[in-house]
Amino acid sequence: MNKLTTIESHFLQQQKLYPEINSEVTGLLNDVAFAAKLVRREVVRAGLADILGLAGSTNVQGEEVKKLDLFANERLINAIGQHGRFAIMGSEENEETITPPKFESGEYVLLFDPLDGSSNIDVNVSVGTIFSIYRLKSDNPSQASIEDCLQKGADQVAAGYVIYGSSVMLVYTTGHGVHGFTFDQTVGEFLLSHENITTPEHGKYYSVNEGSWNEFHDGTKLFLDYLKEEDKATGRPYSTRYIGSFVADFHRNLLTGGVFIYPATKKHKNGKLRLMYEANPMAFICEQAGGRATDGHRRILDIEPVELHQRTPLYIGSKNDVLIAEEFEQDKR
């Protein structure tokens, strides 16, 4: 693999290999990569730029908004919307859909979480941006509406995430494998570092907030107990790895193998993660890498959304681990 393959060169290569990845799609992805550079610049200097801490408001989810959340949200909307490729957008931070600048020529829909895990930014823990791209269903971009956003995850054109950690990586899929790029600040470019990522069928880690144990249903508790039992034949016990930043936990498990779960609980019967902004894009990536993603009963990508900020339980990661989790959730074990 050529370590000096820029993300733009890679997109052009993909465009030649797969006719459905046209210049518009590669343009969309380049826009996202550019926006990620802007967010990355502020994330790495957040402590010096007075954008740490709370902004004094709450978002549509009822969560306190961090200053950096607002910055990332604004930068993504402005940087990605300026080229007229998107007719409509949806952000985890905005209650309503967003009409971007130059929307009149847009043929696509963008849904994104501008800064996932931002509650960790004040203590220098990895955070990330998650994005999802769909084709516009409306014939006329000026008529784009929330209905264009409410599409199944299986209809995604592309999805990806950017993780801002010890290095900055952009990972994406268009349905033709999963590829990762590491940002080289000396040249200011994302360079191909992880080509055709595949995730192990069996993992060795599980990621869950066990502080919610008393809120878990019996199936979830039994699955976690199963992972902790010693059985050399199945590689158990698993080790716990939980950062509390979904992008960071997912990224580690994608590369090393494992399962991330955010189940339904007695307090949150529909789960807590957002279907459109978090579960769908990560499920697309996970499946393309050979993994599996469900809500415990259904494939995530098959769920018909009814709300822009719809929530869902999530079991995602190594295929066999998720299958076992489903068996416990469905009382088959």
UniProtKB/Swiss-Prot annotation:
Cofactor requirements of the protein: Mg(2+)
Any one cellular-component term (Gene Ontology): cytosol
Compartmental location: Cytoplasm
Record's keyword terms, sorted: Calvin cycle, Carbohydrate metabolism, Cytoplasm, Hydrolase, Magnesium, Metal-binding
Enzyme class, first EC level, given as a word: hydrolase
NCBIfam families associated with the record: PRK09293.1-1, PRK09293.1-3
Protein's UniProt name: Fructose-1,6-bisphosphatase class 1
Source species: Chlorobaculum parvum (strain DSM 263 / NCIMB 8327)
